[in-house]
UniProtKB/Swiss-Prot annotation:
SUPFAM superfamilies: Concanavalin A-like lectins/glucanases (SSF49899). This is SPRY domain-containing SOCS box protein 1. It is found in: Cytoplasm; Cytoplasm, Cytosol. The SOCS box domain mediates the interaction with the Elongin BC complex, an adapter module in different E3 ubiquitin ligase complexes. Essential for its ability to link NOS2 and the ECS E3 ubiquitin ligase complex components ELOC and CUL5. The B30.2/SPRY domain is involved in MET and PAWR binding. Residues 33-231 form the B30.2/SPRY domain. One of its GO terms (molecular function) is ubiquitin-like ligase-substrate adaptor activity. One of its GO terms (cellular component) is cytosol.
């Protein structure tokens, strides 16, 4: 789980009554997964070939990083001192809902580890160690170590994220988490251990935005795996019904779909087959 730290480590878990104030906060409107996002996360991930189409762009990067030949979902940063280096994804999104998973080991983040989105004009290199993603008006980033959101950082103050944190608290972001970009609503959000953390940025509609990260740790390796996307059309009733059935069963009981008194074709549909 993502962890919330004060004097000691506290685990963010809505099922734990010890953290009832936090539980109530996370159950508030801003922390409820949007319906379309909930549906997308229930869908099987896209094929590896599609993931490659949405992976890091080896032609759109700082010279101090490179996409690995043996795993093109991962990029590697050279151990260059006093340098902050970034890379964009291959695909810029203008419409639809898109979710990708970032895997970035906590021990490889260093002082400035930032994940977010950027236009094609955002810089991908800076001298020194800095919050490069979110540094100007061309990018939007979440600093994983500081729990701060940055956009146009030279002119605008950063904001706490997740927003429920108190001033003396720190949220420990685990090795893997999800990024959700909704270009129809114009929002960027993050999901940690299945918990929707709320909207991080708004006002993104009408832009063309690419996945981006900036890093300072030598030899760090960061993986991006595109999970799936949804077009902006209204959700089909059949898809909504399928989601309702799967929710009623729960993930641990999805295997029981085969025992339901339903036609084989409907069972296959419920199982995304």
């Amino acid at each position: 789980m993502g962890q919330k730290v004060t004097g000691g480590i506290k685990t963010v878990d809505m099922r734990d009554p010890t953290y009832r104030p936090l539980k109530q906060e996370l159950q508030g409107l801003d922390y409820c997964k949007p319906t379309r996002l909930d549906l997308l996360l229930d869908m099987p991930p896209v094929s590896y070939d599609v993931q490659l189409l949405h992976s890091w762009n080896n032609n759109d990067r700082s010279l101090n990083v490179f996409v690995k030949e043996d795993d093109k979902l991962i990029f590697h940063r050279h151990p260059v001192a006093q340098s902050t280096d970034a890379i964009r994804g291959k695909v810029g999104y203008t419409r639809g809902l898109h979710v990708w998973q970032i895997t970035w080991a906590m021990r490889q983040r260093g002082t400035h580890a930032v994940v977010g989105v950027a236009t094609a004009d955002a810089p991908l290199h800076s001298v020194g160690y800095t919050t490069l993603v979110g540094n100007n008006h061309e990018s939007w980033g979440w600093d994983l170590g500081r729990n701060r959101l940055y956009h146009d950082g030279k002119n605008q103050p950063s904001k706490t994220y997740p927003a429920f944190l108190e001033p003396d608290e720190t949220f420990i972001v685990p090795d893997s988490f999800l990024v959700a970009l909704d270009m129809d609503d114009g929002t960027l959000s993050f999901i940690v251990d299945g918990q929707y953390m709320g909207v991080a940025f708004r006002g993104l509609k009408g832009k063309k935005l690419y996945p981006v990260v900036s890093a300072v740790w030598g030899h760090c390796e960061i993986r991006m795996r595109y999970l799936n996307g949804l077009d902006p059309e209204p959700l089909p009733l059949m898809d909504l019904c399928r989601r309702s059935v799967r929710l009623a069963l729960g993930r641990e009981r999805l295997g029981e779909i085969h025992t339901l008194p339903l036609p084989a074709s409907l069972k296959a549909y419920l199982l995304y087959q």
